[in-house]
């Protein structure tokens, strides 16, 4: 049996794919290495979504190739979106790579590894539209929180996005399969479950009944013992209906936090980018959400420099950001992706787009500072994530913060805390976008 190392790049959905491959490898009797040095095969599960992700993936491949040249690792197998996107080009441009699997071939990870170990190259690209095969996972997040992917692929076909070409059409997992996995995760210590897909709001709409099943799924997840927080990401504005709002508002386990990617607010740009809905829909939705779900934290993503964005359209976006005061915003520079309709459209100057993204970040920074200042004096429930040796402090997150992408709460405590503890923290300060406070018994 062999020792297999894994590197997972990109989003949480990619991480789940990697965890499933790890499970298959272990089930076949191989050992999953904690690092990569000493591995007989290194699997690099890549992201190829935008230019920066492609560059990161290539850097990791080259770094691993350097270790291979030194004899510190054996074979290199590249999987994920970069391999799906560039296929044979990877082997041609990087001969150090021994094999590639597309996004439709994750289930073939074990035979691919065994083929590599027998001295053969591997190239396998299965159908990206095939139903996902259910399997276990080797969870790589801290024990107390886990991601659960409820669907694969995307059928939205936004003009700027390459994902449907890499991941195939939208395919929901069966509800019972999702619930079974969630129960296993909870039994193994998961307290915060983070629901992800390319578009969680369309869960179930590809089944014969064409019914939105996210509300039903969330209600069933709330019945699982051990789960304390359930967080929902990637909900599209045109699919948020009253039933979903009612479930989020009424279920105590569902944190009052929604990740709603809007990308822009200008009607002309939304139409050109093949986004359903318009500015009026978004504004009315946000107003309804704020009214129906008190304390709701809205996260979104915005893209600066989309084709057709002149100064007038950009200023409209800035004003929208100031008026809507979304608590969490990721601002990105438009990246023209070959093979997408937007790549052939007239582009905004790259430097102008970069400056616009920085402007959005500055506006949002002020909004976040004001939001954080408003938390001072409040006692908030915080999930402890760990201890920072350098800061000599525990840290965690409130319901307003998703792992890795949002802020932290620095916790002063006279008693030792443990990862996965829920504690009440009275906020007494703000530090570089994070909150700070002390443990209190106050509810």
Please name every model-derived segment.
Residues 1-203, 243, 254, 258, ...:
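Proteins enriched for Cys/Gly/acidic motifs involved in redox and nucleic-acid/cofactor modification
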Residues 4, 41-42, 146, 193, ...:
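Conserved beta-strand core positions
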